[in-house]
């Protein structure tokens, strides 16, 4: 790096001091080459600058070749980066599409799971409702049975108490108990007591 920088500095200094008047006449160009017979250059140079001139021409040739190579390398590098970018974009698209597919599969699984859970919950609620209904029916039945028993007990108590009273023959019947009983009333009360449960 240091050698190249020093060479470039020398070239700049020698180019400033050696080249003062350069005249190039128009020369016919054949196949991209200048015809040397018709052209002439007048250069006022001090002696010993031919080597530097040759060295500079070689350097310029090398730098021009290097710049062409650099440009070519940059183009190739750009093309390579473009290709890599395309592959990266394609792989990202594939990953995104794969992610979308996985996400869709996952959402489908979740939807199925939710549906199954809802069905299970509906079944559980239905079973619980049936159990609750059966319990309520049992409770109603037990309550009705208890009411029937209470009614029967009450009827027995009433029938038993009725056996101590006389009844009128008119409707609605009235129950009464005279303070003094006649013998016929006494036999009627005894008969009612024997019929009572």
Curated annotation (Swiss-Prot):
GO biological process, one term: RNA splicing
InterPro entries found in the cross-reference section: Pinin, Pinin_SDK_MemA
Biased composition (Basic and acidic residues): 34-43, 53-71
The protein's role, per its UniProt record: Transcriptional activator that may participate in the regulation of mRNA splicing.
The protein's name in its UniProt record: Pinin homolog 1
Sequence segments annotated as region (Disordered): 30-73
Chief place of localization: nucleus
GO cellular component: cytosol; nucleus; spliceosomal complex
Keywords in alphabetical order: Cytoplasm, mRNA processing, mRNA splicing, Nucleus, Transcription, Transcription regulation
Record's keyword annotation contains RNA-binding: no
């Amino acid at each position: 790096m240091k050698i190249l920088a020093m060479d470039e500095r020398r070239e700049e200094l020698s180019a400033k001091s050696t080249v003062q008047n350069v005249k190039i006449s128009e020369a016919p160009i054949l196949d991209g080459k200048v015809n040397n017979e018709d052209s002439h250059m007048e250069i006022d140079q001090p002696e010993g600058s031919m080597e530097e001139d040759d060295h500079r021409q070689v350097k310029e040739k090398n730098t021009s070749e290097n710049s062409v190579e650099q440009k070519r390398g940059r183009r190739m590098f750009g093309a390579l980066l473009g290709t890599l970018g395309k592959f990266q974009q394609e792989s990202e698209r594939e990953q995104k599409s794969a992610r979308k597919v996985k996400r869709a599969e996952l959402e489908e699984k979740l939807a199925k799971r939710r549906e199954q859970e809802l069905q299970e919950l509906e079944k559980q609620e239905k079973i619980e409702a049936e159990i609750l209904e059966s319990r309520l029916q049992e409770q109603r039945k037990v309550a009705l049975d208890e009411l029937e028993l209470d009614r029967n007990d009450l009827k027995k108590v009433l029938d038993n108490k009725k056996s101590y009273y006389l009844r009128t023959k008119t409707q609605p019947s009235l129950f009464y108990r005279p303070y003094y009983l006649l013998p016929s009333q006494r036999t009627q009360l005894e008969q009612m007591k024997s019929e009572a449960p």
